Amino acid sequence: MKRESNKNFNLLLTASTFSNLADGIAGFAYPWLFSLLTRDPLLISIVSVLVNLPRLIFVLYAGVIADKFNRQKILTYTRLGQVFLTSIFIVLIYLNLDYIPKEVQFNEPQFESKFLIISAAYLLAFMFGLLEVTRDNAAQAFLPQIVSKDNLPKANGRLFGIEIVTNNFLGTPVGGFLIGFSLITPFIFDTLLLLVSVFFITGIKGEFERPEDINKDQNTSEMIKEGIEWLKNNTLLKRLAIYTGIANFFGSMQFPIMILFAQELIGLNAIQYSFLAYGAAIGGLIGSQVANKINAKLEESKTLLISVALFGIGMFAPYLTTNPFIVAGSFGLSSFGSVLWNVQAVSIRQALIPDILLGRVNSVYRLLALGLNPIGAIFGGAIVKILDNSFSREFALKFPFLLGGIFMLILFLSAPRLLSQKLINKTKNNTVD
């Protein structure tokens, strides 16, 4: 396929800027709204479960979609689907504004339409998850169509950088600011930003229809099997996926209870909580800017090891303290390590996997890397609820951070052997079994 100029990448980067800003606003607004509806950690964690569940049950089909159909159109239609779902949620919130509490209540809120709103939120969360897994898989497969392999690490670094700036630096505090006006304001902005993103995606020029040698009439299960077999025979990518999956499991275990941790143990309001995320934003932004330079100076195995160490330290720190500045700093370490890992791992697999299989193999990889997220989320909420009955509320909310830190230490100690530079070099030279 003919490579387009930097113009196409800049259009993709701009589209990602607006869609990630929308995601950042929504990423703050939805959990905060839900914390006004209930104080039950299990009920809150179910939202995260449903958003992530499609990564477990639908991701392999998303890979087939990305290989069968025009990836640019997939990015367009999934964003429009998000606009439609968000619009439904706006109407639902508007009709119930008089009943939803305006401030956090540490006792369980009670109002007539509570069950309806929570049930609708669960359904919409699952639908959002379906669109997101389809969009994200297509996006990672689309990038090599407009960027040369040599420029993939730099391009991925810029995309991760934009994601962090808009998602955390801008999206989270803007979400906190907007929700101060009205509960529906952040969601209205979300839909507008997604529409702007669609405008830039459709401006990308090129021939992005799938090649004729892809048999679109081939049985879906056979296409999925091809992707599974390819990854099964690549030891490096298989291990990278498993490592990512374990780390994401414990990250997703912590995420749904973080809002309760911040409100109850640190005592933050909406604006203060949004600024807590600046720690993650700063760490991730620095990581996105230096990842390419670090990758150029260090062997891949060393970069991956540093990533695991930083992510683990950041994951464990909130167990030790509720100081908001230290917690924000721990978020920064985790984010830096996560970006460093992702730039390296994503670039490796984009360079190694053939375009004709990229969507499917990428989906199998993401199944291993992200498929445990819904289980981690429900486990996190359940374990807090169980421990809350036998121990202090503080210990219950801190325990997921202790557990995550322990398992990240295990990953760190095993990485030098399982993700060795020798294995990486063999894989790049196509000599791996």
Where in the sequence are the language-model features?
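Transmembrane alpha-helix termini and helix-breaking/packing motifs in multi-pass membrane transporters
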Residues: 31-37, 91-104, 169-189, 264-265, ...
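C-terminal ends and interior cores of transmembrane alpha-helices
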Residues: 80-113, 309-322
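Helix-loop boundary and gating motifs at the non-cytosolic
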Residues: 1-56, 233-280
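Helix-loop junctions on the cytosolic side of multi-pass membrane transporters
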Residues: 96-97, 141, 145, 187-217, ...
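Juxtamembrane intracellular "pre-TM" segments in multi-pass secondary transporters
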Residues: 1-9, 206-242, 433
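Loop-to-transmembrane helix entry/capping segments in MFS-fold secondary transporters
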Residues: 41-42, 149-159, 270, 355-365
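C-terminal transmembrane bundle of multi-pass solute transporters/carriers
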Residues: 56-61, 68, 72-74, 78, ...
